[in-house]
UniProtKB/Swiss-Prot annotation:
Job of this protein: Component of the large ribosomal subunit. The ribosome is a large ribonucleoprotein complex responsible for the synthesis of proteins in the cell.
Subcellular localization(s) per the UniProt record: Cytoplasm, Cytosol; Cytoplasm; Rough endoplasmic reticulum
Protein name: Large ribosomal subunit protein eL18
InterPro entries on file: Ribosomal_eL18, Ribosomal_eL18/eL18-A/B/_CS, Ribosomal_uL15/eL18, Ribosomal_uL15/eL18_sf
Organism: Oreochromis niloticus (Nile tilapia)
Self-association and partners: Component of the large ribosomal subunit.
UniProt GO MF annotations: RNA binding; structural constituent of ribosome
Chief place of localization: cytoplasm
GO cellular component, one term: rough endoplasmic reticulum
Record key words, sorted: Cytoplasm, Endoplasmic reticulum, Ribonucleoprotein, Ribosomal protein
Keyword Ribonucleoprotein: yes
Gene Ontology BP term (one): cytoplasmic translation
Length: 188
């Protein structure tokens, strides 16, 4: 007699609306749902899907990365579109003239972009300026830059593992003996 397969965890999660109750986000969803339905542009469908995403899947993007991505050939005079936050980067001295559209822009980043003669748009302004996403470049931040990703992967302590262990402290007495030195058992 076989054991029945458990079906309790085999659903594919597919968001149909954002989890957030933010009314302004909901208005954007309403707008882009209309655009995605009425225009056959894949840009609007992608923006709509990204508006549904959780905060961890909408990582912030720094101004420095934005500049680097917009310097690539064929991207001059285009609008950089970020479904997320644009943050400032103090390591960059001079910012070129940028035209960006984002959900949020930090005060420092906004000040520096506007000072350089750039423009900061909201998504409803973008819908009027570029309803089919023409003349835009969709960008996103690095998802795996979060500190938590350092703890994922092969178990810490196994050979060739660079995974960060969850330890209380980095002192002499914490995860420094067995497995780390030949005199205590073995060395990986």
């Amino acid at each position: 007699m076989g054991v029945d397969i458990r079906h309790n965890k085999d659903r594919k999660v597919h968001r149909k609306e954002p989890k957030s109750q933010d009314i302004y986000l909901r208005l954007l969803v309403k707008l882009y749902r209309f655009l995605a339905r009425r225009s056959n542009a894949p840009f609007n469908r992608v923006v709509l899907r990204r508006l549904f995403m959780s905060r961890t899947n909408r990582p912030p993007i720094a101004v420095s990365r934005l500049i680097r991505k917009m310097k690539l050939p064929g991207r001059e005079n285009k609008i950089a579109v970020v479904v997320g936050t644009v943050t400032d980067d103090v390591r960059i001295q001079d910012i070129p003239k940028l035209k960006i559209c984002a959900l949020r822009v930090t005060d420092g980043a906004r000040r520096r972009i506007l000072k350089a003669g750039g423009q900061v748009m909201t998504f409803d302004q973008l819908a009027l300026a570029s309803p089919k996403g023409q003349g835009t470049v969709l960008l996103s931040g690095p998802r795996k830059a979060r500190e938590v990703y350092r703890h994922f992967g092969k178990a810490p302590g196994t050979p060739h593992s660079h995974t960060k262990p969850y330890v209380r402290s980095k002192g002499r007495k914490f995860e420094r003996a067995r497995g780390r030195r030949a005199s205590c058992g073995y060395k990986n």
